[in-house]
Regions:
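N-terminal secretory signal peptides that target proteins for export/translocation
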Residues: 1-3
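Sec-dependent N-terminal signal peptides
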Residues: 6-16
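A generic "folded-domain core" signal
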Residues: 22-144
Length: 144
């Protein structure tokens, strides 16, 4: 199953909080600004950490933005970074994450999700996050 399907499943859990569905999601714990969870689908596991924005602008624009770091052991995928915005991204503008002098561009965009295409960049961004650095995500919605 693709990461998009897993993220969509996760968003359904977060949005509707249906107890029958939520039983498949196991919350592991909360660590500072991060929450860790495991989804078990058949015999496959998806482990991930998610963080909500500490600050959002504009404040009047309500959305369910998240930054994810996913692990899919059955597929030998580790440290996969993606974001969701709660709105469709504008493909005319780049989506970036900045922390100090470090800048990361999300190259793969599909509606309201975006991924880093380069594994080396994912590793660098993970190292930045491990240092406890704040990260600012910049993106534009489809309306501008």
């Amino acid at each position: 199953m693709s990461i998009i399907r897993y993220v969509i499943i996760l968003l359904i859990f977060l949005t509707f909080n249906n107890q029958a569905i939520a039983e498949e999601v196991k919350k592991i714990g909360k660590f500072k600004d991060w929450e860790t969870m495991v989804i078990k689908n058949n015999s496959k596991l998806v482990c991930f950490a998610q963080s909500k924005p500490v600050l959002q602008s504009p404040k009047s624009y309500k959305r369910e933005a998240r930054l994810f770091v996913s692990f899919r052991p059955n597929e030998k995928i580790i440290n996969e970074i993606n974001i969701t915005s709660g709105y469709k991204f504008n493909n005319e503008n780049s989506i970036t994450a900045k922390s100090g002098k470090h800048k990361y561009k999300f190259d793969i965009i599909q509606e309201n999700f975006a991924w880093l295409a380069d594994n080396k960049m994912e590793k660098k961004m993970i190292n930045t996050m491990k240092k406890g650095s704040r990260i600012m995500i910049s993106a534009y919605n489809q309306e501008g």
